[in-house]
Regions:
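Beta-strand-turn-beta hairpins that frame and shape the catalytic cleft
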Residues: 3-12
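Class I S-adenosyl-L-methionine
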Residues: 24-30, 40, 80-226
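Short, charged N-terminal beta->alpha structural module
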Residues: 1-3, 32
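Conserved ATPase-coupling elements of RecA-like P-loop NTPase cores
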Residues: 37-44
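Short strand-turn motif at the edge of the Rossmann-like AdoMet-binding core
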Residues: 34, 68-71, 186
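Conserved SAM/SAH-binding loop
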Residues: 14-19
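Conserved Class I SAM-dependent methyltransferase catalytic core
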Residues: 45-96
Length: 226
């Protein structure tokens, strides 16, 4: 299959990850999957657990890291097969939080399954917290007082679920080793592959929506963070 975008470190494929994953090699998976109460604009939002279960059933990697928002329904984690035992949970905090109704949206959460990275000086134990001071896609105002205000700013974003590059860089650093290949089967606008490339990893991104493939390719080609 011909990549939608390719450079010396990254390949992006436009298509269904369930069809593409069996054809590629990757050491670690770091992704932000479609979750049960996801924005309906996201492909796969009608059956997120089924989508994740199907994708993981054809994946062959040592580690799976799933990043979820604080308001994302975590029951999707039941879709992770037993062949990847639970490893740890990490908190990806925001220095400037927002509000979603009654909930203070001050962190994402990452769940890791499978093998830890190789033990080395400075990497004997895996920490559990990362702090990010800003996002790469600016929302216009950081403190959304109501669910309606939150949704209005989300609707104006290039992607319904952007993640902070610093958070994903941290996940790449602590859940993969230099020189390995990281795959993101729900690539979106390419934050994971951008983070992996910057950390001397190879990366493969898979995205079913061509408009997001285009944005990811543009970010990589221009070397931009937004």
């Amino acid at each position: 299959m011909t990549p939608y975008y390719e450079d010396s470190a990254v390949q992006i494929y436009h298509g269904d990850c369930r069809e593409i994953l069996p054809t590629i090699h990757a050491d670690r998976m770091i992704t932000d999957p479609v979750w049960p109460n996801a924005d309906p604009r996201l492909a796969g939002s009608s059956d997120p657990a089924g989508l994740l279960r199907s994708a993981l059933s054809v994946a062959n990697c040592k580690t799976v890291v799933l990043q979820l928002g604080r308001c994302s329904d975590p029951r999707i984690l039941a879709a992770v097969p037993d062949k990847w035992p639970f490893l740890c949970v990490s908190w990806l905090r925001y220095a400037v939080p927002s509000y979603r109704g009654r909930v203070l949206n001050d962190a994402d959460v990452a769940y890791a399954f499978g093998d830890a990275v190789a033990s080395a000086a400075g990497r004997r134990v895996v920490p559990g917290t990362c702090m990010s001071t800003r996002g790469e896609f600016l929302r216009g105002h950081g403190r959304n007082r109501t669910s309606q205000q939150f949704q209005e700013t989300q609707d104006a974003m290039p992607h319904p679920a952007p993640r902070h590059l610093k958070h994903v860089r941290w996940l790449v650093q602590w859940f993969s080793d230099e020189g390995e290949t990281v795959v993101d089967p729900f690539c979106g606008t390419g934050t994971t592959v951008l983070a992996a490339k910057g950390a001397n990893r190879k990366a493969v991104g898979i995205e079913i929506e061509e408009r997001y493939c285009e944005l990811a390719a543009r970010r990589l080609a221009q070397g931009v963070m937004f």
